[in-house]
Regions:
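Residue-level hotspots at or immediately adjacent to binding/recognition sites across diverse folds
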Residues: 21-355, 361
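Bacterial N-terminal signal peptides that target proteins for export
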Residues: 1-8
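N-terminal signal peptide c-region/cleavage motif recognized by signal peptidases
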Residues: 16-18
């Protein structure tokens, strides 16, 4: 059965068959591509369409889409050993990502799930690399471009518009957007080096990168994900050292997500859905961004859960590394490691509690 049909059917069965105390919170479905040595998921939309990349036996990366019909390779510019990554997908099935042959500058690409064999190049005439990070439901793309990186917004009407840096007078400063929502709010970061990184905010139509304010301007901080209401999550430090998963307030202050580092010292929140459920990673070492860590977690109903311990099956995985996206239905996608230490990916479908048990009846 195709992956997404299976997940949908499973969720329906779960309503009748799950779950009193001790029952797993999620059902695991591996994301696979025949012949792939590794699979790295990047995003899921509310329709359940999923994007990412897979590696073939020759170590070439391919941009890929999964939907109810199975998996589909996304077209890339011609060339030898062109590597592709699909980074984000919106509710309309528009996808953004990159291609790179390590000869030409990195191309930012826009695909449509309905026509995976065609693409639009987002680069302008500057010859600079373009790295999209997100696309909203209006088809507005945000990310970073150039070297050092500068924030940009792309629209079908205006093309690529440079949003610049937070402070152009600072030597070697770089900036990029990490997320954009339907209202046009932008979040991201500026940095000079690993130890000097700060969350930023912007709005589509005003080409500027602005510090988020408050503690985000004085402490290390990085805004990573955002929901439709504009609630941003990411990682930040209260001591200029340890970066932990946080939720940002509009004034730039932030609150640590209790328990989200699990048994690690650090971590990052990566995504938040409109219900306020947050997912991320724990154990990121010295990284200043949401790199794959040692554990993956979900924060729901005031509790952080180690996802590896609340799924019904971990076959094919020795551990989870991160949870990178969550849709409106609470379906989570993320990555882990197999027995050979290759990156593999999963879909976690919520197991809903049966009301007959929720009200206290126990046969």
């Amino acid at each position: 059965m195709p992956l997404l049909k299976f997940c949908t059917a499973l969720a329906a069965v779960s309503l009748a068959a799950a779950a009193h105390a001790g029952t797993p919170l999620y059902h695991l479905t591996p994301l696979t591509v025949p012949g792939a040595t590794s699979v790295t998921v990047e995003d899921i939309n509310d329709a359940g369409q999923i994007v990412g990349t897979y590696n073939d036996a020759g170590f070439v990366r391919h941009a890929v889409l999964w939907d109810a019909a199975g998996w589909h390779e996304l077209a890339l510019p011609p060339g030898d050993e062109v590597n592709g990554i699909a980074r984000a997908i919106n509710s309309a099935g528009q996808i953004v990502g990159t291609s790179d042959d390590f000869v030409q500058p990195t191309f930012g690409l826009l695909w449509n799930a309905a026509t995976p064999g065609t693409y639009t190049v987002l680069n302008n005439d500057s010859g600079a690399p373009v790295l999209p990070a997100d696309i909203n439901d209006d088809g507005v793309v945000a990310g970073g471009w150039g070297v050092p990186s500068r924030a940009f917004v792309w629209t079908a009407t205006d093309g690529l518009v440079d949003y610049g840096l937070e402070d152009p007078s600072v030597p070697d400063q770089q900036a990029r957007w990490t997320a954009i929502n339907a209202s046009g709010k932008l979040i991201g970061f500026w940095n000079v080096h690993v130890a000097d990184i700060h969350a930023t905010v912007g709005i589509v139509g005003t080409p500027a990168v602005v510090g988020m304010g408050g503690a985000s301007d004085t402490q290390r901080s990085n805004a990573v994900g955002m929901n439709a209401a504009g609630v941003a999550v990411g990682l930040a430090s209260n001591d200029l050292q340890t970066l932990v998963p946080v939720v940002f307030a509009d004034d730039g202050s932030f609150t640590e997500i209790a328990g989200a580092t699990l048994d690690q010292d650090n971590g990052a929140a990566i995504a938040i859905n409109d219900a306020g459920v947050i997912v991320g990673t724990a154990g990121i070492g010295t990284a200043n961004g949401p790199v794959p860590g040692l554990q993956a977690w979900v924060y729901r109903d005031g509790t952080a859960y180690d996802l590896f311990t609340v799924v019904d099956d971990t076959t094919g995985f020795v551990r989870f590394a991160n949870a990178v996206a969550i849709n409106a239905g609470g379906v989570i996608v993320g990555t882990g490691r197999d027995a050979d230490d290759n990156v593999q990916s999963f879909v976690l479908t919520p197991v809903a509690a049966d009301p007959i048990f929720a009200d206290g009846f126990d046969p």
